[in-house]
Amino acid sequence: LNEVVNGVAPLRESHPATVGAVMTGRGRDACRNLGLLRDPHRAVRRLAEGHVVSRDLGLAAGPGARRVFIAGRGGGVVALVVRRAGAAGGRLRYLAAVLAGLRDYRPSQAVVDGPAGASWTGEAASVLVCNGSHLGGGMRIAPVARVDDGLLDVVVLGGLGRAELALWLPTVFWGGHLANRKVRSWRAAAFRVDMTGASALQVDGELTGGLPLEITAQAGALRLLV
């Protein structure tokens, strides 16, 4: 779905397009974030009804590339999860991927710049910029994020060690990680993010790169059949 949206998003001013999707992929975070039906037969019938809504996208501009995203963009240990999880999905698969990836984990030096005090400079396990509440196979990284409010949610997992990551990992499925004093979050329409030493970046669950990134909310940029 990310590839389709990136194909039509640049044309929205001159040739606006409406996207319809039947989701069968890993994690199905798009269903959770966008309100799509999970059952493919019901989803096809719903598409035929032609009900169109507007949803926000995030736009990430980095060295030589500009891409929009639906769920989120991030770097650090979350990208290691994507690399380890491969093509399969589901919570157990992602949990196993994180546990396996802990031996490769190294914290990065991160800089986050946003308005009104939304800033971070220091060691971070991950920096995640979320348009929707779910990513990574059902993880509720930003529980209050919405795809119709014109805002992005940034979540910084501070300098967590391997033992802390293993302990706090299960809590991301209900948003409990936000209770950790090393985790910070902010909401705004635009952020600048840089990470030194990040081994990989992910966008909507797929590996990509590079840094630094200027990330902005694109309010109502996606016309979607639901």
Residue ranges and their predicted role:
Residues N2, N6-A125:
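Catalytic core of DAGKc-family lipid kinases
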